[in-house]
UniProtKB/Swiss-Prot annotation:
Record's protein name: Large ribosomal subunit protein uL1
Family annotation (CDD domains): Ribosomal_L1
GO biological process: one example: translation
GO molecular function, one term: tRNA binding
One term under GO cellular component: large ribosomal subunit
Family, similarity comment: Belongs to the universal ribosomal protein uL1 family.
Chain ranges passing through the membrane: none
Pfam families documented for this protein: Ribosomal_L1 (PF00687)
């Protein structure tokens, strides 16, 4: 029988509500904040007892229902992501010894594909070579819904395996616009310095700009919001990004 402490749950709920109200009171919802000020605020109001993820949400002026306006890609995080990423490489048998020196957590061939079929999906990123894509396609229905299927557009189907493993391990974030035209991603940890968070924000926004579909008309970036796992969001002043300011001129 479960031993549930109702009083503790109620107390924890009260503390959370109190903390979130206090955090919200420090944010002017009518204001668009400079990126440095926004980073300072989210660090100040962070109240969770764990190292929260710093999240970014971007509203785009695209129609994702049109296939030529789907925004998708990867952004390299200069400050890293604060996460340990487990990487699996699926390659031809004759490439096993070569790719075992890349720093991947596991390097295999058909054995990894069979493990996936059995439900053993123990890695955060799967990388493969073009020559193995026919074999890997056998598990597309398993990896695809989890966002783990190797994809040439994301750089995870490549012959330059060593370079991609290095980039993934050093910290990069995948992004894809949702049906409402929004992109959400975790771009670091609240324990990062303000300068480290800013560097990641700039890199992420720059990657979004570079991924702008030529068919998208009107304002592309409509809103950028910063928050932590448990905290309220802070709206950023889009003009505070040099890349965006240059694009608008």
């Amino acid at each position: 029988m479960l031993n549930i402490n109702i009083n503790k749950i109620a107390k924890d709920g009260y503390i959370y509500s109190k903390n979130i109200r206090l955090a919200k009171s420090k944010i002017d919802k009518q204001k668009c904040y400079d990126v440095r000020e926004a980073c300072s605020i989210i660090k100040e109001i962070s109240f969770a007892k764990f190292n929260e993820t710093v999240d970014i949400a971007i509203k785009l002026g695209v129609n994702p229902n049109h296939s030529n306006q789907v925004v998708r890609g990867v952004a390299a995080m200069p400050s890293g992501t604060g996460k340990t990423v487990k990487v699996a490489v699926i390659c031809q048998e004759e490439k096993l010894d070569e790719f075992k020196t890349t720093g991947a957590d596991i390097v295999g061939s058909l054995d990894i594909i069979e493990a996936i079929k059995s439900g053993n999906i123990d890695y955060d990123v799967y990388i493969t070579t073009p020559a193995m894509m026919v074999a890997v396609s056998q598990v597309a229905r398993i990896l695809g819904p989890k966002g783990l299927m190797p994809n040439p557009k994301l750089g995870t189907v490549t012959n330059d395996v060593a370079d991609v493993v290095k980039k993934v391990k050093s910290g990069q974030v995948e992004f894809k616009v949702d049906k409402a035209g929004n992109i959400h991603a975790g771009i670091g940890k609240i324990s990062f310095s303000i300068d480290e968070i800013i560097a990641n924000i700039n890199a992420f926004v720059s990657a979004i700009i570079k991924s702008k579909p030529s068919e998208a008309k009107g304002a592309y970036l409509k809103g950028i919001y910063l928050s932590t796992t448990m905290g309220p969001s802070v709206r950023l002043d889009i003009s505070s990004f040099t890349e965006i300011s240059n694009e608008r001129r």
